[in-house]
Amino acid sequence: MKLATLCYIKKDGKTLMLHRTKKENDIHEGKWVGVGGKIEKGESPEECAIREVFEETGLKAEELKLRGLLTFPDFNNSEDWYGYLYVVEKFSGEIIESPEGDLKWVEDSKLFELDMWEGDELFMRWMMEDRMFSAKFVYDENEKMKDYSVTFYD
């Protein structure tokens, strides 16, 4: 079991997206995603999210809003992944060159034109509607979504 965080940083009707292009053997290669990563030993989800936002963007997240809990069973024929999904609207600092890929502010109206995971398209819509949810996304060996389920808490 892997625990992780995923953050979407928002400003002026735009979302900071990461185009994964720089890591070798990256399951997310070529996809547009939020920023985040694995929770380290002794770290809370919030501490992880703040650390990952800083490491990948150079920005200091000043306020996190929990929007969702994500479950990816047997992802990439590996372990189950569980994620905490946050929105960040209060932050400071300047964007750096990310070690993960290319960062770009994308108009919210253009987000779904990007190449992203099928499940991400679903949960980003819920996130943008300010809905709190718990969702499970099942992918096949070809990285296609086979099924999903969601519970809303609003």
Q: Where are the regions a protein language model picked out?
A:
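Conserved hydrophobic/aromatic beta-strand scaffold that supports enzyme active sites
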Residues: 8, 17, 83-87, 105
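A conserved beta-turn-beta hairpin within the catalytic core of GNAT-like acetyltransferases
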Residues: 26-30, 79-82
